[in-house]
Curated annotation (Swiss-Prot):
Name of the protein in its database record: Toxin Acra III-1
One Gene Ontology term, aspect cellular component: extracellular region
InterPro entries hit by this protein: LCN-type_CS_alpha_beta_dom (IPR044062), Scorpion_toxin-like_sf (IPR036574), Scorpion_toxinL/defensin (IPR002061)
Cross-referenced Pfam families: Toxin_3 (PF00537)
Signal peptide feature range: none
Length: 76
C-alpha cells in the first residue's frame, strides 16, 4: 500500500533537490523541520511520508511546529 505524503517546499516555494535516491539524511532532516518523522529522496526531490498540506510550505510548517521561544515568546 502506498503511504500518503507530499513534496515539501523551501522558502522560495521549490521542492528540495536531492541526489542520493532512497534513504537520505538530508531529506530526513528536511521532513523533521516540516513536522513529520520520515522522508527520503524520490525522483531527485525530498518526499516526506504523512506530510499534510498545511505543512508543505516551510513557513507554514515553522508556524505550526516551531518551539523557538525567541520567535514565539508564548510558545507554540
Amino acid at each position: 500500500a502506498d503511504v500518503p505524503g507530499n513534496y515539501p517546499l523551501d522558502t522560495r516555494g521549490y521542492s528540495y533537490y536531492c541526489t542520493k535516491l532512497g534513504e537520505n539524511e538530508f531529506c530526513k532532516k528536511i521532513c523533521k523541520i516540516h513536522g513529520v518523522s520520515y522522508g527520503y529522496c524520490y525522483n531527485s526531490y525530498c518526499w516526506c511520508e504523512y506530510l499534510e498540506g498545511k505543512d508543505i510550505n516551510i513557513w507554514d510548517a515553522v508556524k505550526n511546529h516551531c518551539t523557538n521561544t525567541n520567535l514565539y515568546p508564548n510558545g507554540k
